[in-house]
Amino acid sequence: MGMFDFTDRVAVITGSTAGLGKGMAIALARQNCNIALIARRADKLEEAAAEIRTLGVKCLPVPCDVTSDESVANAADAIIREFGRVDILVNNAGTGGPACPVAELPMGTYKNLVELNMTSVFRMIKTFVPYMEKAGYGRIVNVASVLGMVGHLEVSLAGYASAKGGVISLTKGVAAELATKGITVNAIAPGTFPSESNGKEFMEMNMPFVLRTTPMQRTGTPTDMNTVGD
């Protein structure tokens, strides 16, 4: 048995059909937490939800584009209709790369990196915090990155790094604002994890650096996140 019991709690997790997001959903479900999965692809959502339901909890798949105000508002409405509450919010959706010199990074690409990796986090918090404030309880976890704190010495990821650095600063600001309202806000900063958003080319290019600079000499895996609640 784990240390925590989230019976009757409801967690909303973005980017939750694979990788870190799915790992965190599984970890919470194993501690009896009901789950609302948010991602773009309905087919992948249904697959992930079916797997999580085998753990004996309720799981609502919610197709949603976290870069859209309307889509996020509609997702919130669906979740509240189903569960009547939101206790935990995990902002995991994001995308990596591209790896290129800052002078060569197109402005459109940079704006997309900021929108998905940082602005979407603000949007989700803005949308769901009122429900937490009303309940006097909430736990928000934002997935940042180690690159939001230190630069990559061999591969230029300045666009991605700046967005994740923004997530860290946003976390600090919102944590201070909500500290007296029963709501905690924290960020985790993972290292390199294989994911669809990173892509095969980036992982192959990044692996030599990861192996040289990581004591365990490996990347993270979704399984590493399955014990978050233990």
Q: What are the roles of these predicted feature ranges?
A:
Residues 125, 163, 171:
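Active-site helix of classical SDR
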Residues 10, 17-19:
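Conserved glycine-rich cofactor-binding loop
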Residues 96-111, 134, 154-159, 199-204:
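Conserved mid-core segment of classical short-chain dehydrogenase/reductases
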Residues 103-123, 137, 141, 167, ...:
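Catalytic Tyr-X3-Lys loop
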Residues 130, 176-180:
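Alpha-helical segment proximal to the catalytic Tyr-Lys
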Residues 42-43, 63-75, 107, 224:
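The beta1-alpha1 cofactor-binding region of Rossmann-like NAD(H)/NADP(H)-dependent oxidoreductases
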